[in-house]
Amino acid sequence: MKLTCMMIVAVLFLTAWTLVMADDSNNGLANHFLKSRDEMEDPEASKLEKRACSKKWEYCIVPILGFVYCCPGLICGPFVCV
């Protein structure tokens, strides 16, 4: 019984994964995502996407662990932007 339930869940998961990852011949999904992002009307929402960045030799946290990122063109070395 448990094996049957696991098989059903696995088949449903793989079916959903296949449908989500399927390539749309006319890029229908890609166009919807780009359109909704480009036509965003709320200016406050765009402010939320901007993050403060750390300049060279300033303290940073690895992006996976924290919220302080290095400015464009720099990478977070061992706890400082280089």
From Swiss-Prot:
Q: Does the keyword Disulfide bond apply?
A: yes
Tissue specificity here reads: Expressed by the venom duct.
Q: Name one GO cellular component term.
A: extracellular region
Query: Propeptide residue ranges?
Result: 23-49
The protein's superkingdom reads Eukaryota
Q: Name one Pfam family in it.
A: Conotoxin
**InterPro entries cross-referenced by the UniProt entry:** Conotoxin (IPR004214)
Q: Which GO terms describe its molecular function?
A: ion channel inhibitor activity; sodium channel regulator activity; toxin activity
Compartment(s) where it occurs, according to its Swiss-Prot or TrEMBL record: Secreted
Keyword list, A-Z? Cleavage on pair of basic residues, Disulfide bond, Ion channel impairing toxin, Knottin, Neurotoxin, Secreted, Signal, Toxin, Voltage-gated sodium channel impairing toxin
* Function summary: MuO-conotoxins are gating-modifier toxins that inhibit sodium current by trapping the domain II voltage sensor in the closed position to prevent opening of the sodium channel. This toxin has a preference for Nav1.4/SCN4A over Nav1.2/SCN2A sodium channels. It blocks Nav channels by interacting mainly with the C-terminal part of the pore loop of domain-3. It also blocks fast-inactivating calcium current. Blocks Nav1.8/SCN10A sodium channels and has potent and long-lasting local anesthetic effects.
Q: Which family does it belong to?
A: Belongs to the conotoxin O1 superfamily.
The remark listed among the other comments is: This peptide was under preclinical trial by Cognetix Inc under the name CGX-1002 as a local anesthetic agent.
What the entry says about domains is: The presence of a 'disulfide through disulfide knot' structurally defines this protein as a knottin. The cysteine framework is VI/VII (C-C-CC-C-C).
Instruction: Write the protein's name.
Output: Mu-conotoxin MrVIB
Q: Record the organism.
A: Conus marmoreus
